[in-house]
């Protein structure tokens, strides 16, 4: 009864449901965890279908925070702040009154450490000078609609395989920021990630009741429709996002400002991910 009351308070209307989904996902840094929990609550009869859909919509918004954290990590070494945070967290954990805060900081620090390690691994791979990788991406026409669909499917399959849209987003940012992958293909991968991440909740709902399966399916349909309307205005929408961030998507590699311009690529991907989910 107490859990039912808490969930009911968090989802009294659509706005509070969306806000709850956003905050929970921002805290746990996993939209998959939020959607799977939501589906299980529907299966247990603790949430209605309408309440679950609002929470899932919020989860889509909350997951964009991870993209912004990762994009910021490309501007400075995020791991420099991790070790002091670990130290502070350990002190707080041994304090009875602030143990919960310490546990929270400790968990967030581990997440940042993982993101920093993933970023550094990508840099150490030196993909910008890996000829087979360069040849593979160069074989695609960046202006072709077929290429966009291909990378959308690649993004979906990769996310389904690794079960983490954040990991695929980090890989996409690394490929784009090193100049290996053009921005249009990178954004197509991000769109695919938004579809691939919905598979987990649908798998979790296979043995659930009808309402839970509908909640999981609503997540997939919602994201697929989002991708379809973006495809209709693909390039104008990207130009709009690039203009907002201040990125010149037409700049050539021999331009003296190319490196400074490429540094904004991770922010373009994060901005697109946010506007797409909003």
Predicted features and spans:
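Interfacial helix-loop-helix linkers and transmembrane-helix boundary segments
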Residues: 1-9, 49, 97-104, 208-218
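Alpha-helical transmembrane segments of multi-pass inner-membrane proteins
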Residues: 16, 20, 53-54, 98, ...
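Hydrophobic core segments of alpha-helical transmembrane domains in multi-pass membrane transport
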Residues: 21-25, 85-95, 107-118, 152-159, ...
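Membrane-interfacial helix-loop connectors
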Residues: 25-28, 34-60, 68-80, 85, ...
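Alpha-helical transmembrane segments of multipass membrane proteins
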Residues: 66, 162, 166, 197-200, ...
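Transmembrane alpha-helical segments and their short flanking loops
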Residues: 115, 122-123, 127-142, 206-278
